[in-house]
Design a protein with these regions (language model features):
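Amphipathic alpha-helical interaction surfaces in cytosolic regulatory modules
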Residues: 23-98
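Intrinsically disordered, low-complexity boundary segments flanking structured domains
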Residues: 1-2, 87
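Generic secretory/membrane-interface signal
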Residues: 16-18, 60, 100
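A short, terminal or domain-edge coil/loop segment
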Residues: 1, 95-108
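A charged, well-structured terminal subsegment
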Residues: 102-124
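Residues that form or immediately flank small-molecule/cofactor binding pockets and catalytic motifs
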Residues: 10, 83, 105
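STAS-typified acidic loop motif
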Residues: 2-34
Length: 124
């Protein structure tokens, strides 16, 4: 399995088991993300802790996840970035657009805090 999906109560976590997320594998990730979205999943955490490299195709898949979540008023969080991957995210200024957390536990906390914030805004 290249991508492992774990459905939780409030979100789905997609873990990438690939060392490289490139043009060969990004379409499969995009397909999985679209499937989750069409299944009613609003909140997604992508865990890239095992991924050492990705290119523009990998970035595109990550942006698809962000767009799909936002399109249904959901939350997207990226976690487990290796230093080289984190550098690429910073260089491309995606760190200003995406919710990024260093660890899975922090990603879950961030997702829950964002959800509480949205719930409070909708009650106002």
């Amino acid at each position: 399995m290249k991508f492992v999906v774990e459905n939780k109560e409030k979100y789905s976590r997609v873990s990438c088991t690939l060392e490289k997320l490139d043009a060969q594998h990004s379409p499969e990730l995009k397909s999985e993300l679209v499937h989750l979205n069409k299944s009613g999943i609003k909140n997604i955490i992508i865990d890239l802790s095992g991924t050492r490299y990705y290119n523009s195709s990998g970035l595109s898949a990550i942006l698809v996840a962000n767009r799909l979540c936002k399109g249904v008023d959901g939350i997207f969080v990226l976690t487990g970035l290796e230093p080289a991957v984190a550098k690429l995210v910073t260089i491309s200024q995606l760190d200003t657009v995406l919710n990024i957390a260093p660890t899975l536990a922090e990603a879950e906390d961030l997702l829950f805090m964002e959800q509480v914030s949205k719930d409070l805004e909708s009650e106002s």
